[in-house]
Design a protein with these regions (language model features):
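C-terminal auxiliary extensions adjacent to catalytic cores
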Residues: 139-192
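Flexible loop/turn segments at secondary-structure boundaries
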Residues: 7, 17-19, 59, 80-82, ...
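Active-site-proximal substrate-binding core of FAD-dependent oxidoreductases
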Residues: 79-85, 97, 101-144, 257-259, ...
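Iron-sulfur cluster-binding cysteine motifs and their immediate structural context
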Residues: 230-260, 268-290
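Conserved FAD/dinucleotide-binding core of flavoprotein oxidoreductases
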Residues: 1-51, 90, 109, 117
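Extended, hydrophobic alpha-helical segments in both membrane/secreted and soluble proteins
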Residues: 67, 73-80, 89-103, 112, ...
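Extended, non-globular alpha-helical segments
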Residues: 50-69, 138-151, 284, 288
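FAD-binding beta-loop-beta segment adjacent to the flavin cofactor pocket
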Residues: 52-83, 200-215, 223-239, 246
């Protein structure tokens, strides 16, 4: 996206249902920037900001119950992103407007908050998401078949095919053992077009109070070394875009290290961790990235 003051916003989206545990989304993004068509846009510029976030792109098949006592889920908290367009601001705002109407009716007329979900399904947001519902799951068949099906679904039928594809598995179930997948050799950053995680995290303005409790919880502290490292070559070292997780050797013993102060709260670890051993919880108030641009 081209913005004012000669600024360019550049992003890269990778589905978290990838199979190769050696893959690093951060390094794939760096490699993407070296493509001639991308490089010519950013060459000669200065990197001024960085961020990362897990997107909810499951569509209506992944929508949870959107109401509960005293609260409503709106926007990306619910999952209103239009995956084919990679756009969600408009749907998020509309869901917020519907939520506001529902809350007003609840306070003035004592109407149950559950009406929010019905109002949402009657809105243009749900219609838009419904028409896009089959795009994401179709790519589980592979890139070529996914593109062909999406063309038929979106161009010929405009999202009105008489069936809905299902998501076959959770993202964390997609990883295959490390010894079954090819290793990926990523080039070292040149600090001109490509950069490392440490300097990138600095640009997020991430701040956490010293000595606060670690907000990334391990259900079993021994599992990363005894299971995940052995089977998947500890993919947390790569799927985390902020360098939070490391395997270090201390006194000839391998140790799983959590650099929680680097966390930019993308929540990828909570989603992609194959053992589901990592749980992201809310850090102390005010902690996290502070995007200055």
């Amino acid at each position: 996206y081209h913005a004012e003051n000669k600024q360019v916003f550049l992003g890269y989206v990778i589905g978290l249902d990838y199979q190769n545990p050696h893959l690093s989304p951060f390094d794939e993004f760096q490699r993407f920037k070296t493509h001639p068509d991308i490089k010519k846009i950013i060459e000669g510029g200065k990197r001024i900001s960085y961020g990362a976030r897990a997107l909810i792109e499951g569509g209506i098949q992944s929508l949870p119950q959107m109401f509960m006592p005293g609260a409503l889920l709106v926007g990306c908290d619910a999952g209103t992103l239009n995956m084919p367009k990679i756009k969600g601001s408009h749907t998020a705002m509309k869901s917020g407007m519907i939520a506001a109407e529902t809350i007003y009716e609840h306070l003035t007329k004592n109407i149950n908050l559950s009406t929010y979900e019905q109002k949402f399904k009657e809105s243009w947001v749900y219609k838009e998401l419904y028409e896009a519902r089959n795009v994401k799951p179709s790519f589980s068949w592979g890139l070529i078949l996914g593109i062909l099906f999406t063309g038929i679904d979106q161009i010929l039928f405009r999202g009105k095919l008489p069936f809905t594809l299902k998501h076959k598995h959770a993202d964390h179930e997609a990883l295959k053992p490390a010894d079954k997948m090819p290793k990926i050799d990523y080039p070292k950053p040149d600090n001109v077009i490509t950069f490392d995680k440490t300097s990138s995290v600095y640009l997020t303005g991430t701040i956490h109070d010293d000595n606060q409790p670690v907000h990334l919880k391990l259900k079993d502290p021994d599992l990363p070394i005894k299971y995940t490292l052995e089977k998947f070559d500890e993919p947390a070292q790569r799927y985390c875009p902020a360098g939070v997780y490391e395997v270090q050797e201390v006194n000839s013993v391998q140790k799983f290290v959590i650099n929680a102060q680097n966390c930019i709260h993308c929540k990828t670890c909570d989603i992609k961790e194959p053992s589901q051993n990592i749980t992201w919880v809310t850090p102390e108030g005010g902690g996290g990235p502070k995007y200055g641009n």
